[in-house]
C-alpha cells in the first residue's frame, strides 16, 4: 500500500508538468500607433503619444485561441502574475517594439495585461514555458513579419485604400493565408483608419489561415475581441470591422510625439502620489 501511495504521489508532478491551457492556434496582433492616437479623444490632454523611436507598426500581443473564436484567459502560469524582473534582459528592446501609447500609464501595465491575460495561457506549449520565453518569442514573430514593408505599396498616404488593396499588399507577408484587420474611427473626420493586422499562427509559429464566421471574413466569429477603455491595461480605442472601401492609412509624421514610454507622465506621477497618501 505504501509503495502504491508513493507511486501515485510521484505521478502528480507529471500530470501538472505544464501551466497554461490547451489551445488551437495563436493570434499575433500588430497595431498602427498613428491610427490609435489619431482616433483617440484629443480633448483629453496627454491621452495618447507615440514615443520616439517607435516603429511604424508595433506589437499589441500574441493570444492563444480556440477554433470557434473564443480564447482562454488569465490561466495558471509561472509566474501567475507578471514580474518585470524576469524580463530585464530584453526590456530595452521591448520598450521600442511593444510601447505604451498612453503616458498616464506605465509601459509595464501594458506588458502585465498581455502576460497575465494571454501569456499565462500560452505556457501549455514548451515554446512559451516562462514569462521571458513568451516575450522573447513574441518579439521574434514581430521581427519575422514585415507588415510595414508589405504595406508600402498602399501607404502611409492620405488617399483611401480598399480592403482588396490591403489583402493584395500583404499576400506576400502572409504567404497567401487569410488574416484579419480592424479599423478605428477618427472622431474628427469620421474616416476609418486601419488600426491593426491580426495574423493566425500554428503552435510552431508558422502562418496559417484565420478562421472566419462567413459573414465577416476579416474577423473571427461571435467571440470577436473588444479592446475598449473599460479594459485593464492601456485604454486603446475600440476596434471595429473595416469597410470594403475608404480605409485610410495616415502618415505617421502627422501624429508622432516625443515621449518617455517607460514611466507615467507628470500628471500620472502626481495622481499616483495622491493615491498613495492614504496607504
Curated annotation (Swiss-Prot):
The keyword Ion transport does not apply. Its EC number is 4.6.1.19. Glycans are attached at residue 68. It is found in: Lysosome. It comes from the Eukaryota. Keywords: Disulfide bond, Endonuclease, Glycoprotein, Hydrolase, Lyase, Lysosome, Nuclease, Signal. It catalyses: a ribonucleotidyl-ribonucleotide-RNA + H2O = a 3'-end 3'-phospho-ribonucleotide-RNA + a 5'-end dephospho-ribonucleoside-RNA + H(+). It is an enzyme of class 4 (lyase). The active site is at residues 60, 114, 118. GO terms for biological process: RNA catabolic process. It holds the Pfam family Ribonuclease_T2. The keyword Disulfide bond applies. Disulfide bonds join 37-48, 200-210. Transmembrane segments: none annotated. One of its GO terms (cellular component) is extracellular region. Belongs to the RNase T2 family. Probable endoribonuclease involved in the autophagy-mediated degradation of ribosomal RNA and ribosomal proteins in lysosomes. This is Ribonuclease T2 protein rnst-2. It comes from Caenorhabditis elegans. The lineage of its organism: Eukaryota, Metazoa, Ecdysozoa, Nematoda, Chromadorea.
Amino acid at each position: 500500500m505504501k509503495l502504491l501511495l508513493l507511486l501515485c504521489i510521484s505521478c502528480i508532478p507529471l500530470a501538472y508538468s505544464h501551466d497554461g491551457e490547451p489551445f488551437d492556434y495563436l493570434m499575433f496582433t500588430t497595431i498602427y500607433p498613428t491610427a490609435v492616437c489619431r482616433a483617440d479623444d484629443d480633448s483629453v490632454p496627454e491621452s495618447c503619444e507615440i514615443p520616439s523611436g517607435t516603429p511604424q507598426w508595433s506589437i499589441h500581443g500574441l493570444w492563444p485561441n480556440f477554433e470557434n473564436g473564443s480564447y482562454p484567459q488569465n490561466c495558471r502560469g509561472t509566474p501567475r502574475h507578471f514580474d518585470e524582473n524576469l524580463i530585464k534582459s530584453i526590456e530595452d528592446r521591448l520598450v521600442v517594439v511593444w510601447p505604451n501609447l498612453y503616458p498616464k500609464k506605465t509601459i509595464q501595465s501594458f506588458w502585465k495585461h498581455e502576460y497575465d491575460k494571454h501569456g499565462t495561457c500560452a505556457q501549455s506549449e514548451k515554446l512559451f514555458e516562462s514569462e521571458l520565453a513568451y516575450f522573447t518569442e513574441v518579439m521574434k514573430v514581430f521581427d519575422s513579419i514585415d507588415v510595414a514593408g508589405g504595406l508600402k505599396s498602399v501607404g502611409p498616404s492620405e488617399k483611401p485604400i480598399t480592403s482588396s488593396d490591403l489583402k493584395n499588399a500583404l499576400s506576400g507577408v502572409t504567404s497567401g493565408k487569410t488574416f484579419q484587420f480592424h479599423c478605428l474611427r477618427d472622431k474628427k473626420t469620421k474616416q476609418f483608419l486601419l488600426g491593426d493586422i491580426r495574423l493566425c499562427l500554428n503552435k510552431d509559429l508558422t502562418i496559417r489561415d484565420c478562421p472566419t464566421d462567413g459573414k465577416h471574413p476579416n474577423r473571427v466569429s461571435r467571440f470577436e475581441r473588444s479592446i475598449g477603455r473599460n479594459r485593464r491595461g492601456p485604454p486603446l480605442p475600440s476596434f471595429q470591422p473595416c469597410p470594403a472601401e475608404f480605409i485610410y492609412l495616415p502618415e505617421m509624421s502627422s501624429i508622432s510625439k516625443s515621449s518617455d514610454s517607460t514611466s507615467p507622465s507628470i500628471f500620472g506621477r502626481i495622481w499616483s502620489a495622491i493615491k498613495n497618501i492614504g496607504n
